[in-house]
């Protein structure tokens, strides 16, 4: 959520920054709401002053034996009380309308974010590793994976399109990848491992920005036997739960930064993705991801963003996968982000790079929604900055390992860093 004080003091500047990311901020609507709010507040202050003045007169009138005048004054105070209750209701209505609107407004882009309308104008930062040249006809991960235990028909039979069953060697490799990622982040990068719920309420999703704007992207659930039919949601990412662990908290500054990680399934309806990536694991309704979250001092958040990107890169380097880092332009950033880097891994069968990690600094946007604060060196409570990043998407990493490390006979070389997690197995072979 944007800072309302910033909006009030620099409305035009905020509107201009939002326009950079393609959001048309309705300045006239905001001004009208502010005028209503101010009008009600002025009226409230006038009524309170009148009530206080008349209340002081009542005692004096009674002392002078002017009982009729005292009663009239008391009647006035009673009417003012009614008027104040109405003014409070009017102010509450204005505030609720303003708050609901603020929840739908995206974050302001950082000044370093390149301008652009969509993904075609993202800016490449660097490429790492050289895509392998194959001397045989390569296969995609579907053709490679199915003989090794990747079962798309089985997933469709159980749950419909965009679900997958893994068994045997592929299931083990998938598990090994997640375990390797967790160990790297906890043992080398200083993150604390968490296990968090996969079902959350609307307040939690509002805190990180998925609600109210992106409800159609979520899976909704209701509890059996719950007559109220309260809606809950399957998490789209562990960012939601990890970040919300500090909701409503005041963190001592010496405890910052907090570095959190979790391996979880992620559930997404892919409402706007009809017809995209219908083959294979690239776009699924259910997929696993190892998530990184940092809760940091505001002055250190952009250093933390670069660090987090490096942590995701270390996984790709260890798995010997070519990749590139890009800065998302203003028109391609996520709702809550002030700046985002995407890591894209080379996918040989598609002859292109595909997103495998997204690392974002949300500054105080999520913290304001969650009321997540820290106590600074002067004892003042201030909003923290929150960051999140994929470290990595496990299914897409599986795709990259299969395709980049394939052999002519359909076998898959296991990267050295992953072999301890595979019981020393160095190659997956069709049996």
Swiss-Prot record:
Keywords: Aminoacyl-tRNA synthetase, ATP-binding, Cytoplasm, Ligase, Nucleotide-binding, Protein biosynthesis. Its EC number is 6.1.1.11. Homodimer. The tRNA molecule binds across the dimer. This is Serine--tRNA ligase. GO terms for biological process: selenocysteine biosynthetic process; seryl-tRNA aminoacylation. Pathway: Aminoacyl-tRNA biosynthesis; selenocysteinyl-tRNA(Sec) biosynthesis; L-seryl-tRNA(Sec) from L-serine and tRNA(Sec): step 1/1. The gene is serS. One of its GO terms (molecular function) is serine-tRNA ligase activity. It catalyses: tRNA(Ser) + L-serine + ATP = L-seryl-tRNA(Ser) + AMP + diphosphate + H(+); tRNA(Sec) + L-serine + ATP = L-seryl-tRNA(Sec) + AMP + diphosphate + H(+). It is an enzyme of class 6 (ligase). Pfam families: Seryl_tRNA_N (PF02403), tRNA-synt_2b (PF00587). Transmembrane segments: none annotated. It comes from Neisseria gonorrhoeae (strain NCCP11945). Belongs to the class-II aminoacyl-tRNA synthetase family. Type-1 seryl-tRNA synthetase subfamily. Coiled coil: none annotated. NCBIfam families: serS. GO terms for cellular component: cytoplasm.
């Amino acid at each position: 959520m944007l800072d309302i004080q910033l909006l009030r003091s620099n409305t035009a500047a905020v509107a201009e920054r939002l326009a950079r990311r393609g959001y048309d901020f309705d300045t006239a609507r905001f001004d009208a709401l502010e005028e209503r709010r101010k009008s009600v507040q002025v009226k409230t202050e006038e009524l309170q002053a009148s009530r206080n003045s008349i209340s002081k007169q009542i005692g004096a009138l009674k002392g002078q034996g002017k009982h009729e005048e005292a009663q009239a004054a008391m009647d006035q105070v009673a009417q003012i009380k009614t008027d104040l209750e109405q003014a409070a209701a009017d102010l509450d209505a204005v505030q609720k309308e303003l708050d609901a609107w603020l929840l739908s407004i995206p974050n302001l882009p950082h000044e370093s974010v390149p301008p652009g309308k969509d993904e075609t104008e993202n800016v490449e930062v660097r490429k790492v590793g050289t895509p392998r040249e194959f001397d045989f006809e390569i296969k995609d991960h579907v053709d490679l994976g199915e003989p090794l235990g990747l079962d798309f028909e089985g997933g469709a039979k159980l749950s419909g399109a965009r679900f997958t069953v893994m068994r045997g060697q592929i299931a083990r490799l998938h598990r090994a990848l997640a375990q390797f990622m967790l160990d790297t982040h906890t043992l080398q990068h200083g993150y604390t491992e968490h296990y968090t719920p996969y079902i959350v309420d609307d307040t939690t999703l509002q805190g990180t920005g998925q609600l109210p704007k992106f409800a159609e992207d979520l899976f909704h659930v209701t509890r059996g036997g719950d007559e109220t039919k309260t809606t809950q949601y399957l998490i789209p990412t562990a960012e939601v739960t990890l970040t919300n662990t500090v909701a409503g908290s005041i963190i001592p500054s010496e405890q910052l930064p907090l570095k959190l990680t979790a391996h979880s399934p992620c559930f997404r309806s892919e409402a706007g993705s009809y017809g995209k990536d219908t083959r294979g694991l690239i776009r699924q309704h259910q997929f696993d991801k190892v998530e990184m979250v940092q809760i940091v001092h505001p002055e250190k958040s952009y250093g933390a963003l670069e660090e987090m990107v490096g942590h995701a890169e270390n996984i790709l380097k260890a798995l010997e996968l070519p990749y590139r880092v890009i800065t998302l332009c203003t028109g391609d950033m996520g709702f809550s982000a002030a700046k985002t880097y995407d890591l894209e891994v080379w996918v040989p069968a598609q002859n292109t790079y595909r997103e495998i990690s997204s690392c974002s600094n949300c500054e105080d946007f999520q913290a304001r929604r969650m009321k997540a604060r820290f106590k600074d060196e002067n004892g003042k409570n201030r909003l923290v900055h929150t960051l999140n990043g994929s470290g990595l998407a496990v299914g897409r990493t599986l795709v990259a390992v299969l395709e980049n490390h394939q052999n002519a006979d359909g076998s898959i070389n296991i990267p050295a860093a992953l072999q301890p997690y595979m019981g020393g197995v160095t190659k997956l072979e069709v049996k």
